[in-house]
Amino acid sequence: VSAQGGEPPTVSVSIRAASGQERRAEQLAEQLDGAFVRICRTGADAGAFAEAWQPWTRRATHHMVLDAAVRPHPRLVAQVHEAVGGRPRAALRFFTPGDGYASHALRLAAFAGYPWLLPPGPDPTSIAVVLPIPEAAEFARSVPAGDDTPEGVLLQRFAEERGLALLASTADLVQRDGPGAHAPATAFLPAAVAPAEWWRQDTLQAPPLIPVVHLRDGQPLSYEAVPGTSDGWRLRPRRDVPTPHARRFARVMHERLLGTEVARSHLRAAAVLLGVAGVLRDQLLLAAAWGRPSEGFGAAVARESAATLALGTLAEAVPAARRPDGAAELRETFEALYEEMTAILRGSPRPERGADP
């Protein structure tokens, strides 16, 4: 596999360490054995921002910026090299938090079997991003002093201005690992390794209508492309998605959800959970028109994307979802819903564990 000018891809890494994160950054650097790594102490000034993005070795074809407060995939460096080999001229994002509207677009891509998504507008998060070396240097120079715009928004703007594709991986290669209540990655699979050909498969363009969940109240909504608006997207009331086997879907949702401890935790919890399960159903129905995951890694990414749907979106609407036991119950329940819903779509009574959706 070659990157630029026939060279095999080589990635340098800058680890950003805020005050108090120095030891975490050192530990992360030790885990990235075999990569060119340096640690950048960050601050509020634009100089610290630019330092992290400025390439610092001539031996690299691409440059990655990582936050110190992450847990990397055990084979992060090897998988990034394979991904870069498949998409050498793109900006690549390897973490998408499971609570944003972009995560729902990413789930659609995963359910259809795609490794990459051209996301719906900017995502403020940018804790694991790779740029080709020339673009990384240009991006480092492009941020004006005193600009407090979120880095992910700046990256999106930069990519659009330079005609650079900014792609989000449906398989996350890092997980947040710091204090505080943060949404999990959309699909972090530390025990699974993508085959090299995975990263060379097609990219899904974010569709103009994405079923999503409102973060504050857990209600189903539609995230829609609206030309002429500032970022091109707006929240709208939920749109009906044509649903074959509607009664079977409803029965599965009620059977799986209404008996859970989380559903019984307070007055609105059951209704909220049913609404979120309806979003999963709608996403699966839309994705089925574009494809389905292959056996093995693609199916694992899709299953994990479903398992995190409620975890990423219900922390405010259903307090029990924040407890470890509640989160574990929701993960298990939504993974089971995914299996049963995909079985309905295929017309079989129930799939074997790990079967191809």
Functional labels for PLM-detected ranges:
Residues 9-16, 36-39, 69:
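Hydrophobic targeting segments
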